Amino acid sequence: AYKGIFFGTRSVLQGLVARGDALTINKGEARDYAKYEYRKFMLNVARKYMPMWYLKDFVKYASWYKFTDIQVHLNDTSYNGHSRFRLESDIPGLTATDGYYTKGEYRDFQYYAEDYGIRIVSEFDTPAHSAVFIDNNSELGFDGTHLDIRLNSDKKETVYKFIADLYEEYMGGDNPVFVTDAFNVGLDEYNSAYKEDMTQYTQYVMDLVYNKYGKTPMAWASMGCVDSDKTKIPDYPIMDAWANYAISLKSLFNQDYKLINATNKYGYIVPGGNNGYPDFAKEEEMYNNLSAGKFRDKMGAGVDVAEGHPKIVGGSISLWNDRGIFNGISVYDVFARTQSILPIYAQTFWYGKDNDKSYDQFKAEVNTLGT
């Protein structure tokens, strides 16, 4: 397949770079294949707009380290009323006025990324993190940030229709805006008092994505995904497991769906720092402790399983930009905080944890490869 061939060229090119001025590479047969299917990076462009040139440059950088996916977080609730939707939309008043992507350029961007072996996973984060939708139409809201999906609410059907129409605008028709075979439905951080309501909503959006639009649903693993040890949703989604306080990480391994290790112990970066997350990653600690089988959140809670566990399909880093619009962070500052952690995740979720190589040795090798 194209992606495998492309990643093979990265291996050859990296081998040449490592040889310095020799411009030769050893003759023979090489086998270089990933231990896990996905290496993903989530960019929150809703809280801080990132121009298209930056997204394209980031694709090229991530592809050098054989990342497979870039998730683009297109809407979010933010601070000081700064909630944004970053796509051109047919819905009056929804599109951000301080930076957005036209449908055409976003469609072209996905094809551009495919040339570099990268799949773009677009995300609409609902039913929480939805202030931008509620600000535009108050009939959708349970409060200022949560869509009203309560089973006994008069607004429920309005919300469900809104979501169906929103999905159709970007995934329907003969020339859809979202062209890749996966879509992230969000599901992050809804009020935990409404588990059954959330479960039904989860079933609804995943059915639309999978059965109507033929895409693999991806989501943040949160309440509503499981009920004790008995699944209530289908087995085809891929879940980002991020925090034990959002859902029992141990319970996820009793379900049928696949898991991406997106735990916030090492996988969350917030430029400027916020809510206990670092401004810059502790890279040496990350290198020494990151493991595909360690599902531990920033509080240390969670579960450890063996590397290579059949339910683990990859790892993910998330750049949240909680305060990015207010603390003067530029896209160059964002890159400075992410540049050196991509190789660590690439190593961990391609080859696996290397206990025989010190961080200093690893860093020297990365510096040799350059960008």
PLM-predicted stretches and their roles:
Residues A46, N75-Y79, E123-H129, D188-Y190, ...:
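Active-site beta-loop-alpha junctions enriched in small/polar residues
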Residues R39-L43, I70-V72, I120-F124, F183-V185, ...:
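Hydrophobic faces of well-ordered beta-strands that scaffold small-molecule active sites
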Residues D143-Y257:
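Active-site neighborhood of glycoside hydrolase catalytic domains
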Residues Y79-H82, H129-V132, A193-K195, D227-D229, ...:
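Extracytoplasmic/secreted cell-surface and envelope-processing proteins
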